[in-house]
Amino acid sequence: MSKVYDWFEERLEIQAIADDITSKYVPPHVNIFYCLGGITLTCFLVQVATGFAMTFYYRPTVTEAFSSVQYIMTEANFGWLIRSVHRWSASMMVLMMILHVFRVYLTGGFKKPRELTWVTGVVLAVLTASFGVTGYSLPWDQIGYWAVKIVTGVPEAIPIIGSPLVELLRGSASVGQSTLTRFYSLHTFVLPLLTAVFMLMHFPMIRKQGISGPL
């Protein structure tokens, strides 16, 4: 076993990486509120795992979406648990994200030299809210349908570009199959990809700059 480890160590310098991770200085003022970002990340990973599991059963069509969700909840093995964990972790992710933003703001974590860390964090907050909006519609029940209709209708108040923007969001003049397809694609592919990209920008900056000091 040691020979296998030595082989990888010689090529990847595993011990140096482990030492860098475990020996990072943590300021004495850090408390449990500095863990909110990590909890948000954990919730995101739970979302990815449970969401991926549900894609095996969910059908993104206006005629089958609701019945497929019912199948997940009543017939699929542990489907009720997976969907429930997905919903609970979604709520927890939004709550932890909001508290994390407040903590960073109140402790001055957005100030020089951490401006870019703050900007990427704000983008991640917007993406988190977008997850909620797009995911809410996927069961295609009465609540989801009317929520989508209201949300996608908001840009209509914008002069000149309002109507084209609404049609872009809905995929047509009215809410229907094109809308559900768009929201499903956003929720399961576009938003997770963008979130992963911005997290890969956000965390290395935190690692490089360290935790901000007390006010």
Curated annotation (Swiss-Prot):
Keyword Metal-binding: yes
Record InterPro entries: Cyt_b/b6_N (IPR005797), Cyt_B6_PetB (IPR023530), Cytb/b6-like_sf (IPR027387), Cytochrome_b_N_euk/bac (IPR048259), Di-haem_cyt_TM (IPR016174)
Transmembrane parts of this sequence: 32-52, 90-110, 116-136, 186-206
MF annotations from Gene Ontology: electron transporter, transferring electrons within cytochrome b6/f complex of photosystem II activity; metal ion binding; oxidoreductase activity
Positions contributing to heme b 2 binding: H86, H187
Binding site for heme b 1: H100, H202
Cofactors named for this entry: heme b; heme c
Binding site for heme c: C35
Keywords recorded for this protein, A-Z: Chloroplast, Electron transport, Heme, Iron, Membrane, Metal-binding, Photosynthesis, Plastid, Thylakoid, Transmembrane, Transmembrane helix, Transport
Principal location class: plastid
Compartments (UniProt record): Plastid, Chloroplast thylakoid membrane
GO terms of biological process kind: photosynthesis; respiratory electron transport chain
Membrane topology: Multi-pass membrane protein
Keyword rRNA processing: no
Cofactor: binding details: Binds 2 heme b groups non-covalently with two histidine residues as axial ligands. Binds one heme group covalently by a single cysteine link with no axial amino acid ligand. This heme was named heme ci.
Cellular component, GO annotation: chloroplast thylakoid membrane
Additional notes on this entry: Heme 1 (or BH or b566) is high-potential and absorbs at about 566 nm, and heme 2 (or BL or b562) is low-potential and absorbs at about 562 nm.
Function summary: Component of the cytochrome b6-f complex, which mediates electron transfer between photosystem II (PSII) and photosystem I (PSI), cyclic electron flow around PSI, and state transitions.
PANTHER family: CYTOCHROME B
Assembly with partners or alone: The 4 large subunits of the cytochrome b6-f complex are cytochrome b6, subunit IV (17 kDa polypeptide, PetD), cytochrome f and the Rieske protein, while the 4 small subunits are PetG, PetL, PetM and PetN. The complex functions as a dimer.
HAMAP family membership: Cytb6_f_cytb6
Family per similarity comment: Belongs to the cytochrome b family. PetB subfamily.
Protein name: Cytochrome b6
Organism: Phalaenopsis aphrodite subsp. formosana
